[in-house]
Amino acid sequence: MELLKGSGLNQTESGGSSSTESSSLSGGLRFGQKIYFEDGSGSGSGSSKNRVHNTGRKSLTARCQVEGCRMDLTNAKSYYSRHKVCCIHSKSSKVIVSGLPQRFCQQCSRFHLLSEFDLEKRSCRRRLACHNERRRKPQATTSLLSSRYARTAPSLYGNANSAMIRSVLGDPTAWATARSAMRWSGPERESHQVMNVFSSHGSSSFTTTCPEMMMNNNGTDSSCALSLLSNTNPNQQLQQHQLQTPTNVWRPSSGFNPVIADRVTMAQPPPVSIHNQYLNNQTWEFTTGEKSNLQYMSPVLGPSQISQPADFQISNGSTMGGFELSHHQQVLRQYMEPENTRAYDSSPQHFNWSL
């Protein structure tokens, strides 16, 4: 009996499982672990997915945001589709957007109120101001140039030359200032600016003397002596120079100083023309040996001035002989020849000074 009961239970269980399998297969066919449904249900699910995709496309379509336009910008340029404005309304002076009269700014790429625009301008006032500031930067080249000249000219050249430079730069009142500064109103000034190069005890040196113009014949002031690379005291040099300078020297009233030597003094004749005023005023002084025999000669003496008789005096009052005088004149003539205009040759030692 129990076996029969157990078999009956097994049959009922198998029948229940078969009924569940049949109910599960009623919706579709089962092959292995996959269940395939009918075409009607499958087509319904596919159409619902396509419907959702189409609605998403419709919502992403770019259109012009101007009221009354709503133009489709799908096939337009990316600029217009990105900013949602058509080509016509992007250049219009007045459109209605969100119920307000506005205008499209081509630099901001946005719509602004009409009060933010200037007349006949396609960009807003704020963008135009920034654009003008970038374009119209102040050029500081002229100001830097003028400040540099104003800073360096007085320190390097002095008052007269700085006035000349200012006259060149365009200052109309600078030329009168330069002319007034060039005039010397003080007493007679005869400053021999002596420059000794490689000077030492017992060695040869080259000294150049550049006397200045004399405006009055009141006195002398030789306080402008400059010595380079020398170990001697400038005050001692000044005293020696004053002792060696003779008193009976011809001083012309035209403003030219005579050529003064250590032992020999040659009175320089007055110049022929005013054009050679500064050229005749320069002299060259050569010192050779330990005895420091100074020889003065002018680098710009012409043949007519050399042929004129020159008065040679010695500090003790005696006069040089004719032979020595002719010898000095020959040296001057050789110096003024074309082949010897660029150098000077002395007999004891050879000096080649390029002028």
Curated annotation (Swiss-Prot):
One GO term (biological process): regulation of cell population proliferation
List of residues binding Zn(2+) 2: C105, C108, H112, C124
Protein name: Squamosa promoter-binding protein-like 15
Gene, per the UniProt record: SPL15
SBP-type zinc-finger residues: 61-138
Species assigned in the record: Arabis alpina (Alpine rock-cress)
Knockout or disruption consequences: Spl15 mutant plants fail to flower after vernalization.
InterPro entries: SBP-like (IPR044817), SBP_dom (IPR004333), SBP_sf (IPR036893)
Motif Bipartite nuclear localization signal boundaries: 121-137
MF terms in GO: DNA binding; zinc ion binding
